[in-house]
Amino acid sequence: IRVTRQARLRRAGRAAGAATSPRLATVTETTDAAARAPLAGRTLIKGHGAQNDFLLLVDPEREVDVSAAEVAALCDRRAGIGADGFVRVVRTAALPGAQSFHEAVPEAEWFMDYYNADGSVAEMCGNASRLFAAVLNEEGLVSIADGESITIGTRGGARTLTRAGELWTVDMGPARLIRPEGAVADLDAEGWDTTVVVPGLEGERAALSVAMPNPHTVVALATEAELESALFAGLTDSDAPDYDPRPPSGTNLELVVPLADEPDDEGGAPVGRARMRVLERGVGETRSCGTGCCAVAVALHEWSGEDAPEDYLIDTPGGRVGVHVGADPWAPGATVLLTGPAQIVARLVLPP
């Protein structure tokens, strides 16, 4: 994503945000006793956003029964198809417990029913939301022309996506500092609230906790060599790294190396740059994480002070995404914009 394209998408995202700002209505999920069809024999769509890959089931009326065990089996890269997460494409009105959400945000006809690779439910995934919109468009469920927007439902609230060719800008909603209970006060005063021991890195590392709205713990490193030395292989947040205080609902860990700012080709303010790795809650290390990139940009902005860039280019192992945090991400009504690709790879039919 070149800076010029990022500036164009930033304007598109702002227009989408002005037209339909995300509502913080949430879904209070319930279970239903209605018998549903098995997942066997169904068609799944495989795709990715910056190599953060997902399996999607188009199930508009929620007719298919999907268990956590089935999700975990399908996402297993050895015994299944392999993916970082699973998404049911469902009408909001068909999701149990979503009635009040649908009434609050009637334009959010479609809901991103998202699950981590271990089958656990998650609030939101930025990369998956772009792929979700692309699938809606590709399957003919909606028509989203270049420059047009769509609002979808997620467990983190409504999200608006704007198409710009092969890229999508997602209004990710507001960022929030978590302020974990038991945080060390003097660390918090300096922009840190947690310490983390990461395998492969020496000693405790200071970190900042950010909600997007799912929880993130961001650690700044000095060099790219140090970033490479972190031992993430085979780890999940359930057994490592070690956090103090320990996040009660788990967390996504981002390791980030700030890089030199990049000039804006349109003559605007410099664009911040960084390289990152992520250990996702319920998944392990992934090639990219949309909410994680947003959390990293917000943390960098917080650490940089008054002259902090409003825009960031974040390089992940899976590619580059752009994040707009604005002049003050904590201001009332402020939201974070995420820009990146969405690519459909294949359609797969499960055995009966």
Task: Please tell me what each predicted stretch does.
Residues A104, V184-A189:
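Short intrinsically disordered coil segments
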Residues R176-P180:
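Short, charged/polar, Gly/Pro-enriched secondary-structure boundary elements
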